């Protein structure tokens, strides 16, 4: 069941779980995790979404009732681009959008612009990932649908950005509001529990992008239930 998700209609905050290329994050195991997210989303009326492998986009989009994002799209048109991820193919898959410029899949400025432009043409949402306040401020000028600030040194760590560098969230939100207050700012890196989520939202964030804290957990349902208490 392919779903649509509109920022203004369906509201915020949102938690986006990036399945990355973890052993637990693809195929049947990844699907089972997303099914847990779907159940929690419905039971507790919260916005949960997943960023998944390109290989799993069609299966997950067809069979889940949560928004599915790609982890990466290339800002290309039809043609000779072997190995690239075509925006039209992602749209066809049923995914609603994509991460752009994740710290583990960084892009140059020209490619970021091209990707956001192509996604806009096709109605795909973009979550532009940035590393710091200056990058977030610059990224806001491209008018992505969402910005997600993640200091790379904290990604996958035990200390949340909202604890280690709260000023990054606060100042990023302030910078974006001066350029386009309609762009929600998410945050990520080290987010593990409801206290991290609550602190992030108190600093002006409108959502969370996280990965290992959920995907690598032996009890993802328990972790997700805890996380949504912070929304």
Regions found by a protein language model. Give the residues of each.
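A structural motif corresponding to the C-terminal end of an alpha-helix
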Residues: 40-44, 94, 175-183
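Active-site-adjacent beta->alpha loops and helix N-cap segments on the catalytic face
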Residues: 26-33, 52-62, 78-88, 103-118, ...
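Non-catalytic positions within long, well-ordered alpha-helices that form the structural scaffold/packing
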Residues: 83, 91-92, 120, 140, ...
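Conserved N-terminal beta1-alpha1 strand-loop-helix module at the mouth
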Residues: 2-85, 126, 134-137, 142-143, ...
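Glycine-rich phosphate-binding active-site loops on the catalytic face of alpha/beta enzymes
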Residues: 96-107, 146-159, 201-223
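General beta-strand structural signal in soluble alpha/beta enzymes
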Residues: 50-52, 68-70, 99-100, 128-129, ...
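Catalytic cores of alpha/beta
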Residues: 131-143, 187-206
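Conserved, mostly hydrophobic/aromatic
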Residues: 20, 53, 90, 150, ...
């Amino acid at each position: 069941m392919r779903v649509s998700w509109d920022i203004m209609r369906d509201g915020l905050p949102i938690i986006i779980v990036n399945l990355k290329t973890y052993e637990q994050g693809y195929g049947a195991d990844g699907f089972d995790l997303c099914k847990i997210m779907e159940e929690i989303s419905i039971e507790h009326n919260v916005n949960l979404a997943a960023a998944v492998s390109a290989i799993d986009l069609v299966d997950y989009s067809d069979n889940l009732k949560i928004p599915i994002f790609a982890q990466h799209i290339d800002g290309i048109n039809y043609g000779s681009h072997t190995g690239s991820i075509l925006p039209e193919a992602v749209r066809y898959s049923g995914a609603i959008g994509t991460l752009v410029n994740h710290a583990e899949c960084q892009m140059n400025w020209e490619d970021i612009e091209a990707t956001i432009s192509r996604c806009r043409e096709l109605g795909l949402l973009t979550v532009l990932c940035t590393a710091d306040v200056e990058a977030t401020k610059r990224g806001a000028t491209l008018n992505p649908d969402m910005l997600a600030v993640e200091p790379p040194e904290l990604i996958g760590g035990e200390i949340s950005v909202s604890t280690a560098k709260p000023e990054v969230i606060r100042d990023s939100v302030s910078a974006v509001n001066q350029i386009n207050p309609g762009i929600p700012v998410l945050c990520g890196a080290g987010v593990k529990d409801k206290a991290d989520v609550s602190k992030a939202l108190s600093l002006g964030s409108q959502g969370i992008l996280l990965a290992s804290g959920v995907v690598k957990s032996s009890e993802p349902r328990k972790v997700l239930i805890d996380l949504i208490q912070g929304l």
